[in-house]
């Protein structure tokens, strides 16, 4: 938010309220809940049936909510790519770990693929591991 505000990029004044709403959704729901799904389903499968089931269902609900939003909006906060998309996209970049089927969510898939082709996203994705490639559908 600070850098967006100072740079005047990806955090425009006109859409700031909606951008903030989606940032808070990412920080309060998308990140923590999908992170828990990663913990139980990907990193520690079989250790807690309750945890695996709970966070699978929550992650599936998040997919549906994001898909519904992206049905009426090109990006999360409106017609333009913003810091809300930047904060949320990395969680979807691990969609193969979720076993939900990103391709079953047309609007979320469109958004994911469009962002995955951005030069800065490609560069950032492989920053720590030059061999990393962004998963497709």
Describe the residue ranges of each PLM region.
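GST-like domain detector, emphasizing the conserved glutathione-binding G-site
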Residues: 1-53, 67, 137
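C-terminal helix/juxtamembrane-tail motif
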Residues: 129-137
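Charged catalytic carboxylate motif
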Residues: 18, 58-62, 87, 107
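Amphipathic alpha-helical packing segments from all-alpha helical-bundle domains
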Residues: 52-70
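Generic structural signal for secondary-structure transition and capping sites
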Residues: 8, 27-31, 64, 68-75, ...
């Amino acid at each position: 938010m600070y850098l967006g505000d100072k740079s005047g990029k990806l955090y425009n004044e006109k859409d700031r309220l909606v951008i903030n709403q989606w940032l808070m959704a990412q920080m309060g729901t998308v990140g923590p809940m999908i992170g828990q799904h990663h913990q139980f389903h990907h990193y520690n499968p079989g250790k807690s049936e309750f945890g695996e089931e709970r966070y699978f269902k929550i992650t599936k609900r998040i997919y549906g909510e994001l898909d519904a939003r992206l049905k009426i909006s090109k990006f999360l906060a409106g017609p333009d790519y913003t810091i809300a998309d930047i904060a949320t996209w990395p969680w979807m970049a691990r969609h193969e770990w979720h076993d939900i089927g990103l391709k079953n969510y047309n609007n979320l898939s469109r958004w994911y693929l469009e962002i995955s082709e951005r030069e800065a996203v490609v560069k950032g994705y492989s920053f720590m591991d030059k061999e990393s490639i962004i998963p497709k559908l």
